[in-house]
Amino acid sequence: MREPTYDASAVLSCNMLSLSAEEEQRHESIVTRESWRQVMEPAMAFLAEFYATVLAMPGAPVQQLLTMANLMHELLQVARSRRCLISELESVLMRHLLETWPLVAKSLDTEVDTLKTLTIGPRIGPVPRSTGGGGLLERWTGGLMTTDLMRGGQAADALQKILSAYTQFFSQVVSLTTTEQHQGMLLGGLGRIHTELTRLVREYATNVYATHQDGPSPRDMCVSMHAVLSATPYDTHVHEAAKWAELADSFSSETQN
């Protein structure tokens, strides 16, 4: 024989019919906060632990940090749309967001600083200090044992790997750029990386290809970059592809002169 079940929602609905609007709102607030205490507090504690673990990873890549920032942003948006963004939840999510964006900026700086340490041929000026963390070079090219790519005798191969890594990196960062608020910072970081890559291509043209024309030409490298980037019909990709086309044209002009 089945035991009778207790339907609390029915009693609650019946009792709330006699409440004023102010009392009903206060009652809903109490229910919401009690639900938060019982259900969401443990979940938020788990999220905080997971988030801290991700952020504490040494040399966390930009893409990983952007994914976490986007997750927090989406949770905020969903909570707002469902009208359940109570102050406790908003505080937790906003704190995570504010902790993440400085790390994104630092990770971009690491990518730039890592590239600054590289040369193809003799370095002009002091060796820039790297902030460490490896950057895309270590993760995608298997690491480099020297800061002068000519020393390994495979400058063209190393440079092409770096350029290929950048096209992937660029596409991933752009696809993860979901808020206009931080778009300028992210595109600015990509622009600084582009500047360092341009320097390396020019050093390759001067110190390697000018004397040993048995490898890929710097112009062909730039044309290849343009082809890969322009295959994605987004404004950011088109703009970046145009920069590489312009650099390719500059090498054509230098050859003719």
Task: Tell where the protein language model's regions lie, with residue ranges.
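Long alpha-helical rod scaffolds of large eukaryotic non-enzymatic complex subunits
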Residues: 1-257
